[in-house]
Amino acid sequence: TAVDPDAVLELLSDEYARRVIDALSDRPASAPTLRNALSASRATIYRRLNELEAAGLVETAVAVDPDGHHRKRYHLVVDELHLRLGDNGIEVAPGE
């Protein structure tokens, strides 16, 4: 999975993004579930999920709930990141 180093570093400095990552590290979740668990606004949760997905840290899958509704569930793509300082600046790569 390719990650965007600048986006990852910016997201890791954001409290809500870190809280979303922490919640998703336990198990995949829908945006409404994250919103309730983190006591954040709908806009905040969706913004962070979109940013995390664009950065290559989160992906979505559609799941069917027991009541028949289709719901997007978000899950972490990586469980470990490596930072390296080199001649080309800061590099961020998924762990192996």
Kindly give the residue locations of the regions a language model identified.
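DNA major-groove recognition helix of helix-turn-helix
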Residues: 49
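Short capping segments at the starts of secondary-structure elements
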Residues: 15-17, 26-30
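Conserved segment of winged-helix/HTH DNA-binding domains
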Residues: 66-96
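Short coil turns linking two alpha-helices in DNA-binding domains
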Residues: 27, 41-46
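Short beta-strand "wing" residues that participate in macromolecule-binding interfaces
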Residues: 60
